[in-house]
From Swiss-Prot:
Annotated S-S bridges: C111-C118, C277-C281, C320-C356
Recorded catalytic activity of this chain's protein: Cleavage of Leu-|-Xaa bond in angiotensinogen to generate angiotensin I
Domain Peptidase A1: from-to ranges: 80-397
Described function: Renin is a highly specific endopeptidase, whose only known function is to generate angiotensin I from angiotensinogen in the plasma, initiating a cascade of reactions that produce an elevation of blood pressure and increased sodium retention by the kidney.
Catalytic center residues: D98, D286
GO biological process: angiotensin maturation
GO MF annotation: an example: aspartic-type endopeptidase activity
Assembly information from the UniProt record: Interacts with ATP6AP2.
Record's keyword terms, sorted: Aspartyl protease, Disulfide bond, Glycoprotein, Hydrolase, Membrane, Protease, Secreted, Signal, Zymogen
Lineage, top ranks: Eukaryota, Metazoa, Chordata, Craniata, Vertebrata
Gene name as annotated: REN
Name of protein: Renin
Top EC group: hydrolase
Location within or outside the cell: Secreted; Membrane
Tissue expression summary: Kidney.
Length: 400
């Protein structure tokens, strides 16, 4: 072998032990905001009644009969957003980066005046962009809390300093709930092409096609600092995982359903007893969701083990004095137990020091999409998460 070939081979082997070249990463800084649920509580809304209404709506949407993919997130509890630019010059939007979906959409200046939720958000104006290209194809995306409708357009989209030509949705019908009180404008799906409504190529796939990233991965960090929880957010890293955000090594789990960030779980245990999912079940790792959710019957069993009281199918509470004595909950993924303590799954309400809400919700999604569990920000805050498109796997490491 020529000397240069030997040196190249040795260099290639050595890169496995070198620290990540963090300078090559593209970063999207995230901000944490009060969730829609928190805003509704502050306004005295009966969350039990609202939960019942949305449960009924979920049933009437007939998810299993839809030809379009169903997004599992209802955004009631979403707390993290980042900023992107659309158009020339860029129009700035606050978006949720959601691994549970694959489309990008923002409200449009063409939004009907009947939808007052549009009025409080930034609106995309195609007339103000010199790079706009008309498409016009109508689309509908169904969520756990309703649906958004609009039409497709094409323009330049800038994410983490990378600009791509992107087909996206201009939303003209935006539901009052939850979007009237949402602090974000739209959603940027980080899912797979198979999940995209209208056959649209997702933003991340366009970024991968440019070959500007070191690795075909992105990773998500959510801050766990509770002292100034609404002032801190997190970061999405495109092209790798930043060692400053995690400790120990990554443990990887292969995706179980092609074209989805879904993996197989082999049990949910309290203390040392496996209560649920002992024979295996499906779980989606969803950056657009804030809490952990599962089938309502399973959640009720889990809540009984914790001694929690059910306010509605999507909200459970405990006496705040119980928090130090509540047991750990472990989720078994890829042969490893990922454990949350009560400090991880109990939410302390600044307006109520008597009843504390648990970051665990019931959610029934019928076949073929469900039944499925969802691991949201409650889980990701504890375990820094890497989404690996090249190897079709998800990695978890203990967050710093």
């Amino acid at each position: 072998m020529p000397l240069w070939g030997l040196l190249l081979a040795l260099w290639g082997c050595s890169t496995f032990s070198l620290p990540a070249d963090t300078a090559a990463f593209r970063r999207i800084f995230l901000k944490k905001m009060p969730s829609v649920r928190e805003s509704l509580k502050e306004r005295g809304v009966d969350m039990a009644q609202l939960g019942a209404e949305w449960s009924q709506l979920t049933k009437t949407l007939s998810f299993g009969n839809r030809t379009s993919p169903v997004v599992l997130t209802n955004y009631l509890d979403t707390q993290y957003y980042g900023e992107i630019g659309i158009g020339t010059p860029p129009q700035t939007f606050k978006v949720i980066f959601d691994t549970g979906s694959a489309n990008l959409w923002v409200p449009s200046t063409k939004c009907s005046p009947l939808y007052t939720a549009c009025e409080i958000h930034s609106l995309y104006d195609s007339l103000e962009s010199s790079s706009y290209v008309e498409n016009g194809t109508e689309f509908t995306i169904y969520y756990g809390s309703g649906k958004v409708k609009g039409f497709l357009s094409q323009d330049l989209v800038t994410v983490g300093g990378i600009t791509v030509t992107q087909t996206f949705g201009e939303v003209t019908e935006l539901p009052l709930r939850p979007f009237m009180l949402a602090k974000f404008d739209g959603v940027l799906g980080m899912g797979f092409p198979a999940q995209a409504v209208g056959g649209v190529t997702p933003v991340f796939d366009h970024i991968l096609a440019q070959r500007v990233l070191t690795e075909d991965v992105f990773s998500v960090y959510y801050s766990r600092d509770s002292k100034n929880s609404h002032l801190l957010g997190g970061e999405i890293v495109l092209g790798g995982s930043d060692p400053q955000y995690y400790q120990e090594n990554f443990h990887y789990v292969s995706i179980s359903k092609p074209g989805s960030w879904q993996i197989r779980m082999k049990g949910v245990s309290v203390r040392s007893t496996t209560l649920l999912c002992e024979e295996g079940c499906m779980v989606v790792v969803d950056t657009g969701a804030s809490y952990i959710s599962g089938p309502t019957s399973s959640l009720r069993l889990l809540m009984e083990a914790l001694g929690a009281k059910e306010l509605s199918i999507d909200e459970y509470v405990v006496n705040c004095n119980q928090m130090p004595t509540l047991p750990d909950i472990s989720f078994h993924l890829g042969g490893k137990a990922y454990t949350l303590t009560s400090a991880d799954y109990v939410l302390q309400d600044p307006y109520n020091n008597i009843s504390c809400t648990l970051a665990l919700h019931g959610m029934d999604i019928p076949p073929p999409t469900g039944p499925v569990w969802v691991l949201g920000a409650t889980f990701i805050r504890k375990f820094y998460t890497e989404f690996d498109r090249r190897n079709n796997r998800i990695g978890f490491a203990l967050a710093r």
